[in-house]
Amino acid sequence: MAVMTDVSTTGTALRTPAAGAVKEGDVEKLRFIDEMTTNVDAVQERVLGEILGRNAGTEYLTKCGLDGATDRAAFRAKVPVVSYDDLQPYIQRIANGDRSPILSTHPVSEFLTSSGTSAGERKLMPTIMDELDRRQLLYSLLMPVMNLYVPGLDKGKGLYFLFVKSETKTPGGLTARPVLTSYYKSDHFKNRPYDPYHNYTSPTAAILCADAFQSMYAQMVCGLCQRNDVLRLGAVFASGLLRAIRFLQLNWEQLADDIESGELTPRVTDPSVREAVAAILLPDPELAKLIRAECSKGDWAGIITRVWPNTKYLDVIVTGAMAQYIPTLEFYSGGLPMACTMYASSECYFGLNLRPMCDPSEVSYTIMPNMGYFEFLPVDETGAASGDATQLVDLARVEVGREYELVITTYAGLNRYRVGDVLRVTGFHNAAPQFRFVRRKNVLLSIESDKTDEAELQRAVERASALLRPHGASVVEYTSQACTKRIPGHYVIYWELLTKGAGATVVDADTLGRCCLEMEEALNTVYRQSRVADGSIGPLEIRVVRPGTFEELMDYAISRGASINQYKVPRCVTFPPIVELLDSRVVSSHFSPALPHWTPARRSE
């Protein structure tokens, strides 16, 4: 096997950078990766033929006029590029109980929920039983690649903070839940055979506990009890791992008491969780003393390696919106490497990072051509991608340096579906392109799994600003930022107010607090669930800036070369000098005084 030490444009096989021996159990998996990435176009042609063949009798493809054709030419000529809004009527019929072959000839087994629609509701992505096999296949490739870079992971355990989220039933009786909740509750996960590379400190019962506090507490106490066995720490998102550290900051005294006595706090009431933890939590006064010593200092720099001294890396997603958490993770971990291992969504699992220990700024994912059929819409200089199907480029024919919007066709019945991810081609491994995640199309604010676009933010501001009218006040201009200086992160909205008229009064703090809550009520269900059920987003904050601040903002932009004729107030700011300018003009700050409304209600028709 030849050495692959960097992103390659030649035919190379995967091998450890140190040229060490590949473990016998990994050889087959690494060979599979090389076969898939060498024969990209042939695999893609086969996958498309399989998808079109098995779904030939569906209502959707029949309406497209394919007449059973399974070749690329017919597919390109007759199947349109679509968004969720185009498919929503078909999906709603399935959700309402129509079991005819609408999108897939295989029965829809459940819906996987994705981030919100323009109406603020979660998208429902149909899935089928054998999709679990494809997901499991991709998971099975991760550790063979990681073993090339980090030896000895089979000699210890992983402390992964994993959680299930609430699920609902559609009117037709199908379950609707997030993709990872579906996976954790599947037999693939619950009945997985022992594997030294997937040996976790968290009992399955703790992961499956729906109560966020009990689940986190149980996983944390088990991770502390096995501190010397932990070789890697992880969560799905960087924000999730930081939430776990914040949990330790708030609860270390109780955790230490439990470890000293060997008795779990009565705050954990779930019987299955208590039983699972009892097998791990034994009296350990010395460990309790160490935890108290480390956590009582008030110095949390490097806390991860101080508490879990054998940790080799963090396994978290730090690309896209999660990149904002990198400095905080570096602070708490003492500079441990961060591994981004795979690229997936509710619609489809796409691929993996063949250089998982690279710098977070250099993460590129190799899309595995067997997971679905992939096409790409070129993104122009303005960052927009047209919906013109004639512009679509095949997976094997993308160009290095270009940006594209990902379009997928899946076994579950999504045909030429625009995912909304914008990717940049960074190179090739064998014949397979490697992509850097650039951004989610149209997303303005994101703390974790929430995604708020400009139109939604505008509606929320309009709804909240109605509370100002009795005071003769209005919002003259606004912008926003996702603030992650504290854990959990929260939305910050900058308002410049205008008061006018003889009856104008000073807008009091109580009213501005209610404006914060009113904005939260107007945001999508994903945001509100994160606030209410998960606690992964903090209260929304409105910072009122002094009059003239947004004029100063424009002056600053023009001084840096912006055209006065084309200048528009940015609805989200991330550039530090601009954030500093805004913060220096703040005259008052207000937080949402309560939680917004959210319930995991049954989906109505």
From Swiss-Prot:
The EC number(s) this enzyme carries: 6.3.2.-
Deleted gene: phenotype: Slight increase in disease susceptibility to Xanthomonas oryzae pv oryzae.
Annotated Gene Ontology cellular component terms: cytoplasm
Record keywords, A-Z: Ligase, Plant defense
Cited InterPro entries: GH3 (IPR004993), GH3_C (IPR055378), GH3_M (IPR055377)
Induction text: Induced by auxin.
Binding residues annotated for AMP, in chain numbering: S115, M342, Y343, A344, S345, S346, Y365, D421, R440
Expressing tissues: Expressed in the inner floral organs (lodicules, stamens and carpels) and at lower levels in lemmas and paleas.
Pfam families in alphabetical order: GH3, GH3_C, GH3_M
GO BP terms in the entry: auxin biosynthetic process; defense response; intracellular auxin homeostasis; pollen development; regulation of defense response to bacterium
GO MF term (any one): acid-amino acid ligase activity
Note, other: Plants overexpressing GH3-8 exhibit enhanced disease resistance to Xanthomonas oryzae pv oryzae. Plants overexpressing GH3-8 exhibit abnormal morphology and dwarf phenotype. Plants silencing GH3-8 produce mostly non-viable pollen grains.
Family indicated by similarity: Belongs to the IAA-amido conjugating enzyme family.
Function comment: Catalyzes the synthesis of indole-3-acetic acid (IAA)-amino acid conjugates, providing a mechanism for the plant to cope with the presence of excessive free auxin. Produces more IAA-Asp levels than IAA-Ala levels in vitro. May participate in the activation of disease resistance by preventing the accumulation of free IAA, which reduces the expression of a group of auxin-responsive genes encoding expansins that control cell wall loosening and expansion. Contributes to late events in stamen and carpel differentiation, and influences floret fertility.
UniProt name for this protein: Indole-3-acetic acid-amido synthetase GH3.8
Native source organism of the sequence: Oryza sativa subsp. japonica (Rice)
Gene that encodes it: GH3.8
